[in-house]
């Protein structure tokens, strides 16, 4: 089995072969830190976290770098609105990012470079572009000469003659008169009144958006990397411009593989802050009461390259699915001791191979999840037999292997059982009273084994039963 990934650059699935055997360099375009992350961000970072986890599971050494854009017009506007500094805004939402990602069980990157911490590298790269004739200074600004780079458009498939002027970057009207060509984009912007600025060979100013990532990739990972990832909305102009800047200087491919995740849609439109149709991660988790694992499952149940529709019905389906998976993930904790699981076991090789076959096919997480659900449903069936009939339908050690397989493979997807207390809170009073009634009926029928099984089952969920005179049973949560 060999991992194949869809490469946006070649527009086909390709066998993954890293530059250095056994090691993977991976760069992800991070957030512009001026607001809380929304569901679109969650999708992107869950997808790339899953890619990273899978590469680690395959045995690769992975160096994962993800930047923060902390110099940007949006941050400046927010700082003016709130009467504070750009750094204060950036620091606040950088911290919020870490909090949100931790809740979604996203592994921390190996390095989080910031634009403000990479200014020397940014200026060196601009100077090299200027020396090689790919950049020119104009009244304190510096622009990249798009027509000088012969391969411009190779990632997005766009041709200059089909583009509108200014399409290659974030443009201010004052810039147009300084450009040699309308398609050129800013590498360095001259200082403006009441805006942060840094000294440079071209005068005080700040970097353009695209040059930041090119410099951070080069500084942290080198001239060429294995995989560059981001949202599909970054293919053009951001990633196209990254390629132009980096390859104009080095003469080497910036990345072997370019991977892009699809957008989250609301009512047929991309979820974005500019459209005002976004829902933040915090709103979903805190106000909506959605479990982080349900949100993760929502992302993984769809092909990562395709758009995904955000609806209440889709979330509810994922909620139901997560309840099934979580019941399976908790099976060993509830029943392992009673089933005599003492020896360690390895994962089921056939099921593991099916999981890997799915993931090797361009991260086919829907097919990989099908393996997990097959295991979880079997564990749930066996649990029902244990509760209601007091026996298993099959071999206890094989069931142990299936549970271990489920836990490990779910972990590759970042899906981990939540604490028992979360599950206990979902068992409402009516359900508890129903179990007590079933236990009472079992005792009346002198089926004390069944009565004990129900007591143990509820105890595993944090429910203690207290039998009192007159056949009354009270309960409490522990």
From Swiss-Prot:
It catalyses: tRNA(Cys) + L-cysteine + ATP = L-cysteinyl-tRNA(Cys) + AMP + diphosphate. GO terms for biological process: cysteinyl-tRNA aminoacylation. ATP binds at residue 273. The keyword Nucleotide-binding applies. GO terms for cellular component: cytosol. A motif ('KMSKS' region) lies at residues 270-274. Its EC number is 6.1.1.16. One of its GO terms (molecular function) is ATP binding. The keyword Disulfide bond does not apply. A motif ('HIGH' region) lies at residues 31-41. Keywords: Aminoacyl-tRNA synthetase, ATP-binding, Cytoplasm, Ligase, Metal-binding, Nucleotide-binding, Protein biosynthesis, Zinc. Belongs to the class-I aminoacyl-tRNA synthetase family. This is Cysteine--tRNA ligase.
